[in-house]
């Protein structure tokens, strides 16, 4: 597995653990209320599981399994994929922190722009590798 895929999967697992933990805390607080402000974790819970876990795992596996080029470097210039990794994680954390601490909407907007930038950067990187392999 390439190093970038390892990092995507590791970060996805970290986001899964955080999202699961936040969800468990909110669920237990719903059954036995002990700290009302735990509901502020809901945006982070959603962000960590939908984009931090699901999307990041998909991108890491896609980088790994998509067809490689016949010549070196086999996966092409990886810079775009690394940029996607950094932008996605910055975006996920910006949106999560903005929701938890009730920061201005501009912080959430910046986080979403970073996430879109990650999608564009990854798409640009992976596009040349979307080819049929016959024979």
Regions found by a protein language model. Give the residues of each.
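Hydrophobic alpha-helical transmembrane segments of multi-pass integral membrane proteins
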Residues: 1-135
